[in-house]
Amino acid sequence: MIVREKWMEQCSGIDFKGGLLEFWENQNPLMEVWYENGFLIDVGYVQRLDTYFVTVVKDDDWAVPVRTTAVQEEQKLFSVIREAVELAVGS
């Protein structure tokens, strides 16, 4: 799993397009990005699965997320986050 400093450094290259970022250390989710249009991007890590989950939610409707993507390769994680940003701001 990415440690917090590395996580923040790698995320610094992502344009969150006005989203409000919150980072946590040693917790799930690792990061949330809130948007004024009601979208939320949640990035979490499940250790027992060795998998990151990037979930896009609209209007706090966790029962029916807009998209959830499972990622096991850290190098792919940030491209999935970028796709989630585009989905959140484009809708």
Question: What residues fall within each predicted segment?
Answer:
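Negatively charged, low-complexity tracts enriched in Asp/Glu with abundant Ser/Thr
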Residues: M1-G38, A63-P65
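Intrinsically disordered, low-complexity regulatory segments enriched in Ser/Thr/Pro
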Residues: I41-Q72
